[in-house]
């Protein structure tokens, strides 16, 4: 079983950009080079209301897959990111996004969940298809996202815990400015087929679901689409004899 699991890829990136206006004293080297988040110095009384800015981002992701057989491949990926931006006036904007899936049509219940892709090859050996196709495969994939944003003024909220995000969402519902859940099955079912004489045919059935929540209300969208394409490639040439006198 271990040999069928693709390598697991883990990634984590954290960036902090900060500016402080009219600082008094010598700035510590650790703050200059980035391993100290605070400079520990006072700012001039003449600085006014624009003390500086703060921009903190954290991104994490994990990717892997499983080759169930020579013909069946499944890949997974999950990502989550947070950002916190504090302007010079002290207003803080926070945003988050993560892979997500809702389990009911009204998006009332859901959970963090990785996106996936599935491919079944060897379909050209199926009855009927084997008479017309040189190669054929079936595809299916899912990608879902939950995104939220908050605005804080005259209050310092707790830090967002990477593993306890639900607690932060519940505790700060009054400060939430927008939220969106998007689920894309692209394709819900896809079919690829290569015929004789360099003819290729594809078919896709896509399904997209989304929920937008704003202070003015909720909007739910459900879209279905069908696409089909066919292409033909011709390769050929001609030979022209050239006389040679020697």
Label the predicted regions.
Residues 1-246:
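Exposed, low-structure sequence patches enriched in small/polar residues
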